[in-house]
Amino acid sequence: MKIACTLVLFVMLRCYVNARNIPGTCRTHTGIILLSGEEWKDPNHCSTYRCSIFDGEAELEGVTCAAYHVPPHCRLVSAANELYPQCCPTVICSDKSR
């Protein structure tokens, strides 16, 4: 019997980025420009970003999966080709009592 544990912990990243010459916008690390209130899910890094205005400045907020400590008899399994949060890893542990 296997026990699947999904940890719902998130890491919040913040950076202040304005897209060049376009007030009220943010630019992602890949160069995508987001308007205030828009969200973008990064398909290569299992994270999501949202552009918002804070104190009159555009702010790009990012959220990604938590870091995991995998106990003995367990393994980390990721869902390939999924977007955040479905791409976050799950800890799968085997039942050693049998």
From Swiss-Prot:
Tissue specificity annotation: Expressed by the venom gland.
GO cellular component, one term: extracellular region
Segment forming the signal sequence: 1-20
Stated family: Belongs to the scorpion La1-like peptide family.
Protein's name in the database: Venom toxin OcyC11
Localization per record: Secreted
Molecular function as annotated in GO: toxin activity
Keywords: Disulfide bond, Secreted, Signal, Toxin
Transmembrane segments: none
PTM annotation, UniProt: Contains 4 disulfide bonds.
Top-rank lineage group of the source organism: Eukaryota
SMART domains: SVWC
Coiled-coil ranges per UniProt: none
Main location group: secreted
